[in-house]
C-alpha cells in the first residue's frame, strides 16, 4: 500500500530528525541541563495533574460534584497564577521563576500526603492551579530562548513535546509500581518529591544562564 509506505517513511523521517536534534543538544550544555531538569520535574507535574481526581476519589472518597469543583478551582486560580509568575519572571528571570514554581510543587507533594478533608483538598487544588500553567508556560518560553538560531524550530519543539510525553509515561509507570508496593496513593504522592528535587537541582545548575538573562533584562 503506497499510503502506508508513505506514512511509514514520514514516521521514520520524523524520528531521524528528532535523533539529530538530540545529538545537537548534547553539544549545548545549557540546553542539556535544562532539558534534564525539565524532564524530571515534568514527571512529577504531569503525574499529579493526571492523578489528582483519582487521588480525591480513591483516597478521600470525594463525590463527583466535589471533584468537579476542584477542577473549576484549579482552572480559575491558574489564570491568576500565570499572571503572577509572568510578572515575577519579568522582574527577575524565567529560570528564577521556574525554581520558585518547582519548589511549590514539592511542597504540594508533602501537603497531599497529609490531606484529610475535602476543604484541604480544595486548597491543595488551588495551589496546584496557581503553579500548573505558570511552570509549563515558563518552561516552554525558557526553552525557546535557549534554542540555536535557525529559521525552523518545528523539530526542536517536537523534541520538547516528546520529552514531556516520556516524562508523563515514566511518571505514571512509577506511580503504578509505588502504589502496588505500598497500597496507598499518599506514599506515591510523597515519593514524587524526589522527581521535583532532581529537576530543581538541575535548574540550579543554570546559574550562569540566569545571570546572563538578568543582565540582558537590565
In which residue ranges do the predicted regions lie?
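Intracellular juxtamembrane helix-capping segments at the cytosolic ends
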Residues: 134-148
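Helix-to-loop junctions at the C-terminal end of transmembrane segments
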Residues: 80-94, 179
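Multi-pass alpha-helical transporter architecture, strongest
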Residues: 190-218
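Structural signature of the two symmetry-related core transmembrane helices
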Residues: 96-111
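Short amphipathic helix-loop junctions that connect adjacent transmembrane helices
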Residues: 50-66
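Helix-loop junctions at membrane interfaces in 12-TM secondary transporters
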Residues: 113-125
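A membrane-interface helix-boundary motif in multi-pass transporters
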Residues: 177-196
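Juxtamembrane intracellular "pre-TM" segments in multi-pass secondary transporters
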Residues: 1-35
Amino acid at each position: 500500500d503506497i499510503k502506508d509506505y508513505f506514512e511509514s517513511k514520514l514516521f521514520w523521517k520524523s524520528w531521524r530528525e528528532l535523533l539529530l536534534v538530540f545529538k545537537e543538544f548534547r553539544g549545548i550544555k545549557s540546553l542539556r541541563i535544562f532539558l534534564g531538569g525539565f524532564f524530571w520535574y515534568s514527571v512529577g507535574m504531569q503525574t499529579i495533574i493526571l492523578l489528582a481526581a483519582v487521588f480525591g476519589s480513591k483516597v478521600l472518597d470525594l463525590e463527583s460534584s466535589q471533584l468537579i469543583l476542584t477542577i473549576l478551582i484549579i482552572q480559575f486560580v491558574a489564570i491568576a497564577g500565570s499572571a503572577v509568575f509572568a510578572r515575577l519572571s519579568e522582574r527577575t528571570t524565567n529560570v528564577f521563576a521556574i525554581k520558585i514554581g518547582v519548589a511549590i510543587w514539592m511542597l504540594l507533594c508533602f501537603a497531599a500526603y497529609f490531606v484529610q478533608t475535602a476543604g484541604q483538598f480544595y486548597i491543595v487544588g488551588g495551589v496546584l492551579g496557581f503553579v500548573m500553567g505558570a511552570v509549563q508556560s515558563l518552561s516552554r518560553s525558557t526553552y525557546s530562548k535557549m534554542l540555536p538560531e535557525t529559521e525552523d524550530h518545528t523539530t526542536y519543539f517536537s523534541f520538547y513535546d516528546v520529552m514531556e510525553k516520556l516524562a508523563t509515561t515514566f511518571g505514571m509507570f512509577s506511580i503504578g509500581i509505588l502504589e502496588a508496593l505500598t497500597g496507598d496513593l499518599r506514599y506515591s504522592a510523597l515519593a514524587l518529591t524526589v522527581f521535583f528535587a532532581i529537576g530543581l537541582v538541575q535548574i540550579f545548575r543554570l546559574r550562569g544562564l540566569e545571570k546572563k538573562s538578568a543582565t540582558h533584562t537590565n
